[in-house]
Amino acid sequence: MTATNKQVILKDYVSGFPTESDFDFTTTTVELRVPEGTNSVLVKNLYLSCDPYMRIRMGKPDPSTAALAQAYTPGQPIQGYGVSRIIESGHPDYKKGDLLWGIVAWEEYSVITPMTHAHFKIQHTDVPLSYYTGLLGMPGMTAYAGFYEVCSPKEGETVYVSAASGAVGQLVGQLAKMMGCYVVGSAGSKEKVDLLKTKFGFDDAFNYKEESDLTAALKRCFPNGIDIYFENVGGKMLDAVLVNMNMHGRIAVCGMISQYNLENQEGVHNLSNIIYKRIRIQGFVVSDFYDKYSKFLEFVLPHIREGKITYVEDVADGLEKAPEALVGLFHGKNVGKQVVVVARE
């Protein structure tokens, strides 16, 4: 039995900001069966995740970025995190009807071979399935690992989160508040700033686009300095943060979205503060911490069910909307976690 299979194809390697014209939206056919003698599963993709790291994979293969993930192959569907339902299985640990989240191609149907720390069976369905693209998936685990494992927070510390209304930042802020920290976030619009203060419980927030002097803005928000910085932006923001860090401050480098579309990345000028203030800066990738995923679920699920942790999604309906949604991410058009709905069942 065959079915039509819509796909989002990368035309060629991307330079600068991606545009919708960098992608083709095509329709092909797929055999609705698993190849004999394999451990593969056939899945119907339900939700797809738009994430900043995907821009890195759109560029030409590079030894540095290869340490994070392989570049996409032009002419093939792009890949990312998604939520899928199994419709046929050749894998002993998965059966028809099971739900999983993990890496899939941007298409309606995919044949995948589930791998440890790349695909996870969904056991808890009393929460929105789309949460497994965000709050309960890679971004949520990123926030948890980066804050607790990398930053080693203590009650009463000051925490700054950039890109704070995004998929990762909105959870980092809530985790920090639960720790008894003083939390400030930045975002790129009044709507997002209001969200940080009214929805996510940040103590303060500011629109970085309205600040002519980021160093002064941070000094205003943190008159006694910053203990922890959760880095999602890079560039000028990192420069301003370094001046405002406290002694023995910690910086968890999760992302640098301000740099991904630049031909020549911006330099950072205030690095001497790392020495003077004994600042610890650590880059991290969420896959290094997936062995703690079950611990993460045990921690976060009760808080979600009790309404102590909330999450905002920006939902695009239909696979044909996926290129627009992904491109919009790099212009700050999304409010909250950007999700693409391929199918709800």
UniProtKB/Swiss-Prot annotation:
Subcellular location(s) of the protein: Cytoplasm; Nucleus, Nucleoplasm
Coiled-coil region(s): none
GO molecular function: 2-alkenal reductase (NADPH) activity; 2-alkenal reductase [NAD(P)+] activity
SUPFAM superfamilies hit by this protein: GroES-like, NAD(P)-binding Rossmann-fold domains
Binding positions for substrate per the UniProt entry: 53, 260
Pfam families: ADH_N_2 (PF16884), ADH_zinc_N (PF00107)
E.C. no: 1.3.1.-, 1.3.1.74
Catalytic activity: an n-alkanal + NAD(+) = an alk-2-enal + NADH + H(+); an n-alkanal + NADP(+) = an alk-2-enal + NADPH + H(+)
Keyword Oxidoreductase tagged: yes
Tagged with keyword NADP: yes
Keywords, in A-Z order: Cytoplasm, NADP, Nucleus, Oxidoreductase
Chain residues that bind NADP(+): 52-53, 163-169, 188, 192, 208, 232, 254, 260, 284-286, 330, 334-336
GO cellular component, one term: cytosol
Expression sites (tissue/organ): Expressed in leaves.
Activity regulation text: Inhibited by N-ethylmaleimide and p-chloromercuribenzoic acid.
InterPro entries attached to this UniProt entry: ADH-like_C, ADH_N_2, GroES-like_sf, MDR_fam, NAD(P)-bd_dom_sf, PKS_ER
Quaternary assembly: Homodimer.
Record protein name field: NADPH-dependent oxidoreductase 2-alkenal reductase
Species assigned in the record: Arabidopsis thaliana (Mouse-ear cress)
